[in-house]
C-alpha cells in the first residue's frame, strides 16, 4: 500500500484478514444528498422546491378568467455566514425569490384569448440552508433533522392473528396507504363479510365502494366469481364439469357419463378420479335437480315477455325458482362457483348485507359516514367521493406508492398514476379474497421493504407544500374579488404562511433536534439516526415488540446493536456503515456479485425487496487466490433471511465487509464479536457521551474506522487541494497549492482559519489545533488540523489507561473504580466546559432597564470585576454569586416608609426607583470569563464596552484580511518574479525595485507579456476584492443587531470551567463496562509491577464474567502488547541505535499475524522511519476490525515481540506494604472514556430555598434549588424507630409549617436552637379540598 507523507507519520497495524473491497462511504451522505435534492432545480419537477411549486401552481380563479403561473425560483445568498449566525443567534437561511406570471384572459373573446400578462419576482420567505456538515443553524443553535422510518405508501395485506374475535378466527384485512390523502381499508368480519373503512371511520360493506364506482350487482358477481353452468334439456339437469373444481369434495350423487360411473355417491373425490375424468374429456355430467338448490344465480334473469325480473342476481335458487326459470324459457342457468374450502362466497354474502342498491344510494351512504349530520345532495356526495381517491389535488400515492402497489398486486409496470383506478380497488379486493381463500401470504409490516426513509429534503418539501396550499387559498379568494387591473403578483402573495410553515418545521418539529455535540462521533451518529417516531410515525406507547425487534432485513441496513435503552428501544435506530437510500427511499446495502462460484469485483446495491430472491454468502467465507469459495458448503442467507448451507454454484452474492451489519458507533468497538449484545449496545451508546479531553490520545487498540469518523464528522480541517504548508499558527494554516491543481488566473493559495475555544451545544469546548508543520507536503483530503477528540486525524474519545483487574479494599465494589492520582496530575481526563450566560435589557412599562455599574445596595467588592459599563472583564475568575453584568430595572412607585424618605432626601431619586436585576454566576459554577459579546438594538446608543468590542473586531477583521492579502500577494509576486527572470531580467536588479514596479516591466516574448499583464490584472483584482471584503465586514460589525421585540441590549458572557476528574465522575470502557470513581488514590499506594510501574486504574474482575463482555479482556491484553512494543521502540531511540535496527524491529511488528495489510518500511526514507518511530514511542496503534479481529495466537505473538509474558498476567506488589500479591494479575491498557455525567453537575445541597405555592413545601430537583423528598416510606421508618421529635420536625418546620420555619430561622439567628411547630400547610390544603366538596370542616383546639 502507498502511504502519503501525512499517513506515514503514524501507521496503524491492521489485523484484518480480508482486504477492503469497498471504502467506508462518506458518512453524512444521507443528510447532504437529501437536502441537495430539495434545493437544486429539478428539470422534471419530480422533487424538491420545483415539485412543490408545480403541484400548487398555476392557481386559477374560480371563474377561470385569471391565473397565476409559476415560472422559476431562485435562492439568494445568505447575509451572514454560519459562524456569524451562531454568534448573533439568527437562522442561517437564504431568501427565496419566485418569478410568477399573472395572466388575465379576455372573457368577451374566444376562450384562451389573453388580455394581459404581468411577470414579477416575488419574495417568498427564507429557506434555512444546510451547513457543510449536514446541520442547520436555527436561532443560533445547531440542529439536526433526523430521518424518519415510516410505513411506505402502497397496499398492505395483514391479519389480526386471531386476536380480535373470541373464537380465535383469523380476520384478514387490506389497507391502501397513499403518500397524502385518505386511507382505504378492507377487512373481513367474523361472519366472513367484507367491509370497507375510509380513514379508519365506521365500516361499510365493501360492495358500497363498488356500487359507488357504478358497478351493478351482476357486474360485481362477474368480477369476483367463476361460473357453474347448468343446462335444462329433456327434463334433465346437466352441469358443465370442470374436474379440478371437485377436488376434495364428497360426491352427493353418482358421477357418471356414458354409462361409466367415475365416482360413487358418498365417496371423496381424489386426484385419481379427476385424472380419469380429464382423460375421458368429460365436460358435462347429469346432476339431480336438488343439486342446484341453494346455488346462487350469477345474473338477473328477466321474463322476456313481461320484462319482469324472474330471478335477480345473487338470489339463491329454489325448486320453485327453477320451475319459473324453465317456464320463462331459459335453457341455461349460470350460478356462482363457491365451496367451503378455497372459493368462499364472501362478496355474494356481503351484497346481502349491503343497504344500497344503486350508485346514488351508495354515494349517499358514504357521504353520511364521512360527514354525519349534513344533509346529502347528489352533487355533494359525488364531489366528496371523487375527491377522496380520484383527485390528484387531494390524493397522491407517489411514485413509491404506485411501485409498491403494482408489485403487491403482481403488475409488472412500476410506474403509473398517483390516484386510484377502479381496477386498483378491485385488484386489492381480489387479492384479499385470495388470501382469505388460503392462496397468498399476508405482508410483514416490519420488513424493510415495507418501511421507507423520509429524510430532510422530503420533509421540508412537504412542509413547504403545506405553506403553499395556504397561500393558494388566499390567492384564489383575492382573484375572485375582481378588479385585477392594478394588481401585481406581489400584491397577491403573502409570504407569511410559507415562512411560518418552514420555520415551524425547522424550529419545533419532533424530528428537528438539538444536535448532540458531545464529540465527533455523537455528531455523526445523530445525523445518521433513523427514528420511527415523529409526525406520521409511531408513538412510544402504541409500539409493540414486533416493531422494535431486530428483523432479518435489518442486515446491512440498520444496526441491530445501537439503539437507546428505555422507552425508545428499537424505535430509534442507526444506519449501518455501508447502507444508503435508493431513489424510492428504501435502504440498500452493497454486495459483491458472485458468478459460477467465483466472486467478482462488481458491487451491487440491493434493497430488502430485491434481496429476498438471492442466496448471499457472509463476508468471512473462505476464498482462494482466484476468489473462489474453498468450502464445499458455505453458510449463507437464503430466502426470507434464513441461514443455511449452500453449494458455491448456488450463491448469487457475497457481503462486502464484516463491518457491514453494524453502525459507525458499534464498528468502533474492538473485539465486538466477543461481547454480549446488551453490553455492546451500552458501549455503542456510551461512546457518544464521552467528553473531549484536554489532550486527545489515540486508542492503542482501535478498529481502523476511526479515521473515517474523524474526517467525515467535519470537526477536523481537511485540505481542499494538495500543496505545501507555507504558514502555520494556532489560528490559521496557509497552503501553497500544487501547480497542477491551481485554476489558471488565481493566486494558488488556500487559507484555512481554525475554530478556537468555542462552545458546543453540550457546553463542551470546540478547539482546532494544527497537526502539520511548516514546509510539509500535503495531499488533497488530508487532515491539516485536529478538532476536539481527534488525534492526527483519528477519532480519540478517551485515554489509554494502564488497568489491573483485581479487588482493592472494597474500592471497586459494584463497578466502582479506583483511580491513581497520577491520572489527575497528568491532566489525562481534564476537560474544559464553556457556559454561555446572557443578560437581556428590556423596555418595560415603567421605563427601560439599564446595564450599568451603578447598582443599588451592592458593595464595592462585588463590583470589582466589572468595567465602567457594568460588564465583567475578560480573564476575570468568577465564582457562584458574582455579578457578571450589572443591570437595574425600574420599579413601580410604592408608599414610602419614613426611612426611605430620609434616604431619598439624602441621596436623591436614584436610590429608590430601581431594583437590582443583575446577571450573576449560578450557584454551583465557577470559572474564567473568556469572551463577552454585546448586541445593541438598531437605533440604541452603544455603550463604551460595545464600542471597544466593535473596534477590536474591526481591527481583527482588518488584520486577518491584510494578512490574507499579503499571503496572496506574496504568492502572486513569486510567480511574477520567476516570469521576469525567465524573460531575461536580472534577479539582483529586480530585488532592488519595488515589487509593484515589476508589473510595469515589459517582456519581448508576447506570450510572457500576456502572462505578465494577466498577473497585473489579478493584482488589481486582489486589491479591489480586499477593499470589498473589508467594507462588507465593517458593515456587518457596525450595523445594529436584529433583536427580539422589546429587547434593547443583550450581553453574552462565556465562562470556561476546567474540570479535573474526581470521585463520583462516571467513566466507561468501550464494551459497556461503566462505573463511578470511588477514590483517587495516591500513586505510591497503587499496585505496581516488578519495574516499579504503578497501574492507573484498578477494575473489579467480577464485572466481567456475568456481563459476558470478554472483549475488554482481549483489548487489555492487546493494549499491553502495543504498549510493550512502544516501550521497546522508545528504549531503542533512547540508546540511539541505528535506523536499520529500528526499521527491522518495526517491520517485524507490522508483519506479525495474517493481516491483509502490508507495510513495507524499506520504501521509507531514514527520516520517515525516525518520525514514525517517534510517533510509536507511546505504543504501536493497532486495528482489529469488527468480526475480523486479532486471533489469540496473534496477541501472544505481539506480547512475545514486546518482551512480555504471553499469559497477559503480571506479578504485582501492594503499594502500601510492598508485599507481592498472591497470584499474577491481568494488567494491560484499556481505552477509557470520561462520560458527560459529571458529579459537579449533579451534586447539589439546599439551604433555604423556594417553596411550592399551594402546599408550601420545598420544591424538588437541582434546577429549582430543591430538597430531597421525605416520603411516605421514610415517615414509616421514623415511626418504626419511634423517633417522635425527629418526625415532628420533618413534618412541620422542615416541610410546610410556614410560621414555624420563620420562627425557627429567627431562633437560630438569635442563638437559641428551639422550635415551635405549628399546623402544617397541608392540613389547610386538605381542609380547603373538603370544603370544595361542600362539607364545612373546622379544626378546634382543645
Curated annotation (Swiss-Prot):
Catalytic reactions of this protein: RNA(n) + a ribonucleoside 5'-triphosphate = RNA(n+1) + diphosphate
Name of the top EC class for this enzyme: transferase
Matching Pfam families: RNA_pol_Rpb2_1, RNA_pol_Rpb2_2, RNA_pol_Rpb2_3, RNA_pol_Rpb2_45, RNA_pol_Rpb2_6, RNA_pol_Rpb2_7
UniProt source species: Pasteurella multocida (strain Pm70)
GO CC term (a single one): DNA-directed RNA polymerase complex
Gene Ontology MF annotations: DNA binding; DNA-directed RNA polymerase activity; ribonucleoside binding
Quaternary structure note: The RNAP catalytic core consists of 2 alpha, 1 beta, 1 beta' and 1 omega subunit. When a sigma factor is associated with the core the holoenzyme is formed, which can initiate transcription.
Protein EC: 2.7.7.6
Domain of life, per lineage: Bacteria
InterPro entries per the UniProt record, alphabetical: DNA-dir_RNA_pol_bsu_external_1, DNA-dir_RNA_pol_su2, DNA-dir_RNAP_su2_dom, DNA-dir_RNAP_su2_hyb_sf, RNA_pol_bsu_bac, RNA_pol_bsu_CS, RNA_pol_bsu_protrusion, RNA_pol_Rpb2_2
Any GO BP annotation: DNA-templated transcription
Family note: Belongs to the RNA polymerase beta chain family.
Known function: DNA-dependent RNA polymerase catalyzes the transcription of DNA into RNA using the four ribonucleoside triphosphates as substrates.
UniProt entry keywords in alphabetical sequence: DNA-directed RNA polymerase, Nucleotidyltransferase, Transcription, Transferase
Protein name: DNA-directed RNA polymerase subunit beta
